[in-house]
Curated annotation (Swiss-Prot):
It comes from Rickettsia prowazekii (strain Madrid E). This is Cytochrome c homolog. PANTHER family: CYTOCHROME C (PTHR11961). The keyword Glycoprotein does not apply. Its main location: membrane. Keywords: Cell membrane, Electron transport, Heme, Iron, Membrane, Metal-binding, Signal-anchor, Transmembrane, Transmembrane helix, Transport. The keyword Hydrolase does not apply. InterPro entries: Cyt_c-like_dom, Cyt_c-like_dom_sf, Cyt_c_1A/1B. Belongs to the cytochrome c family. Binds 1 heme c group covalently per subunit. Residues 30-175 are periplasmic. One of its GO terms (cellular component) is plasma membrane. Heme c binds at C84, C87, H88, M150.
Length: 175
């Protein structure tokens, strides 16, 4: 291959690149992209709660937690709480799994297990896990503490939540 042939090959590559660029510019001039985003379907506006107090108020307005606690069944709560054992331990000095251990959770300060790394959403809550706070959290964790790393969707039936809370209260005394 001589110098002339090499020059012809390089010139052909440069010329082809130039043609491709020119065609691209012309295409952009002729065909303007649609910059308007179309929203398909019907969207429903959802009002998100920004604080745990409003989530607690919403939970308290819709159900009377103390009345539910009077009729709560700890044995039924034990069955429902089996879902929790996938990510939590119930043992007194049990290991922290995906979530912190739940030993003596009722009445315990929030984010108080020192060897567990809580999400920022839970760390900033403050207060204690009483019946009302546990009820609101177990009903829908993502509404109670937006940004929590707990991926559990929640327990939909209010009586089931009361049963779980009673089970957690009694579990400490049964051991």
């Amino acid at each position: 291959m001589t110098g002339k042939e090499l020059n012809k090959i390089v010139a052909a590559i440069l010329f082809a690149s130039l043609i491709a660029m020119i065609v691209g510019f012309i295409a952009n001039i002729l065909y303007k992209p649609n910059l308007h985003v179309l929203h398909r379907g019907y969207s429903i506006a959802i009002q998100k709660s920004s604080s745990n107090e409003s989530a607690t108020v919403i939970a308290q307005e819709s159900v009377n937690i103390q009345e539910l606690m009077k009729t709560a069944n700890a044995n039924h709560g034990r069955e429902i709480a089996k879902k929790c054992l996938m990510c939590h331990s119930l043992d007194k000095d049990g290991p922290n799994k995906l979530g912190p251990h739940l030993w003596n959770i009722v009445g315990r300060p929030k984010a108080s297990i020192t060897d567990y790394k809580y999400s920022f959403a839970i760390s900033k809550l403050g207060g204690v896990w009483d019946d009302e706070n546990l009820f609101a959290f177990l009903h829908k964790p993502s509404s109670y503490a937006p940004g929590t790393k707990m991926s559990f969707a929640g327990i939909s039936k209010p009586q089931d939540i009361a049963d779980v809370i009673l089970f957690l209260k009694n579990y400490v005394h049964d051991q």
